[in-house]
């Protein structure tokens, strides 16, 4: 009887393990396109919502967003000391996730405009001379992504 109990227990454990392996991967929530859109608009509120989510990525794991970034790619992340890195990270987020969704072409212009607006917000607190230099640099970055992607 003891052997039978042990055999049944071993079988139950094997079946339990097998069931765990066969669990299907869950699809992303149906509102993923709306969430992505909300985080990639040109407004400061959109940027702030994305920034908050980026700081709490675990809360958004079910959406399978691509949070990876190379920041400003081949360009400096902080040109002339202006901190463009996080704006570039949001731009990467938009590019990578819209490409994965297959809707990049329809959203590229807005994503590039959002980068430019983000960069101008980085520049806004500087004094007149530094702000002009920063805005000029922001314009150059915007033109580069607009043309080169």
Where are these regions (language model features)?
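Extended terminal accessory/targeting regions
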Residues: 2-5, 18-149
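Bacterial N-terminal signal peptides
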Residues: 9-18
């Amino acid at each position: 009887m003891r052997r039978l109990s042990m055999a049944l227990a071993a079988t139950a454990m094997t079946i339990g393990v097998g069931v765990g392996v066969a669990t299907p991967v869950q699809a992303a929530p149906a509102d993923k396109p709306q969430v992505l859109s909300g985080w990639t608009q040109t407004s400061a509120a959109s940027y702030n919502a994305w920034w908050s989510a980026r700081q709490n990525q675990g809360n958004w794991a079910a959406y399978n967003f691509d949070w990876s970034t190379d920041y400003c790619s081949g360009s400096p992340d902080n040109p002339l000391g202006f901190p463009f890195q996080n704006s570039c990270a949001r731009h990467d987020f938009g590019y990578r996730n819209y490409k994965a969704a297959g809707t990049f072409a329809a959203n590229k212009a807005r994503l590039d405009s959002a980068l430019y607006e983000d960069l101008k917000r980085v520049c806004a607190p500087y004094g007149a001379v530094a702000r002009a230099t920063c805005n000029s640099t922001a314009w150059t970055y915007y033109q580069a992504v607009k043309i080169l992607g």
